[in-house]
Amino acid sequence: MGSAFDPLVTATEDLAAVNSAPPLSNLTQEELKKIAAYKAVEFVESGMVIGLGTGSTAKHAVARISELLREGKLKDIIGIPTSTTTHEQAVSLGIPLSDLDSHPVVDLSIDGADEVDPALNLVKGRGGSLLREKMIEGASKKFVVIVDESKLVKYIGGSGLAVPVEVVPFCCDFTRGKLEELFRDSGCVAKLRMKIGSNGEEAAPAVTDNRNYVVDLYLERDIGDLEVASEAILRFPGVVEHGMFLGMATTLIVAGKFGVTVKDRFG
C-alpha cells in the first residue's frame, strides 16, 4: 500500500493494512490528528468501558465520544481517564467516568503516542502521564494508537526527543545519573524535566499526576533489545515506570499526506 508509513514497515510484515483513505496533503498536523482520532472512535461500541487517552491527539477522540453520546449514537459508555487533564476534559463533556478499581477490565483504550517504531512499540508519556496510561492501557482488551505520520520512527528514541522515565523525588539526581550510565553506549543524556516559570526560566522539577518526577532520556543511537532495556531500567530502585510501551498496541491508525492507514498487529 502506498503510504508514508511503508518505508518503516520492514519489521512488521505480520501487520495487516486494513484501510486507506484518499490523500490529505493539504491538511495541517492538527487536522491530521483529528482525522486519526475520529477513525479510532469507529472502534467504540455502546456499553464499552473505554480508556481515555491523554495528549493533543487523544483529546480529539474524547471529544468525539462525547459528541456521539449526545447524539444518541453511543450509549452506556464508561470512560477511564489516563490523567487528571483527561479527567477534567471528560467531566466537562459529560462522559460518565470510573476507574480500574471499579472496572478492572477495559474493553478498548484510545491514545496517542510520541513515537511508534516498525514493530508498533511506542514511546508515550512525554506529557507526564505515563504511569496511569500504562496501567489503563495494559488492562485493555484492545489498544488503538492514533498518530500523525511525524510520530513514525525507525527505532525507539529515533526522533531525538525524550524517552521519559518516572522516578521518585528522593535522590532523583542519583537515579538520573544511573539511567544515563546505563545507556552510555547509545549516547544517552539524561535530564531531570523542569517546569518553566512565568519568566521563562526553569523554576522547579516537573511533577506527574502521582507526585513523582520525570527523567528524560535523549538517545543518539538505538538502545538495542527493548525488553532487555526495559528490565534494566525497572531494576533501579527509585524508578517507578518508563515510557516505552512494548507489545501493547493492537491497532495503529496513522493520518498522513497519503491518507489514513489502519494497521492491525494480529492481522
UniProtKB/Swiss-Prot annotation:
Expressed in roots, cotyledons, leaves and flowers. Pathway: Carbohydrate degradation; pentose phosphate pathway; D-ribose 5-phosphate from D-ribulose 5-phosphate (non-oxidative stage): step 1/1. Keywords: Acetylation, Cytoplasm, Isomerase, Phosphoprotein. One of its GO terms (cellular component) is cytoplasm. This is Probable ribose-5-phosphate isomerase 1. It is found in: Cytoplasm. InterPro entries: NagB/RpiA_transferase-like, Ribose-5P_isomerase, Ribose5P_isomerase_typA_subgr, Ribose5P_isomerase_type_A. Disulfide bonds: none annotated. Catalyzes the reversible conversion of ribose-5-phosphate to ribulose 5-phosphate. HAMAP family: Rib_5P_isom_A. It catalyses: aldehydo-D-ribose 5-phosphate = D-ribulose 5-phosphate. It comes from Arabidopsis thaliana (Mouse-ear cress). SUPFAM superfamilies: D-ribose-5-phosphate isomerase (RpiA), lid domain, NagB/RpiA/CoA transferase-like. The keyword tRNA processing does not apply. Belongs to the ribose 5-phosphate isomerase family. Gene3D superfamilies: 3.30.70.260, 3.40.50.1360. GO terms for biological process: cellulose biosynthetic process; pentose-phosphate shunt, non-oxidative branch; uridine biosynthetic process.
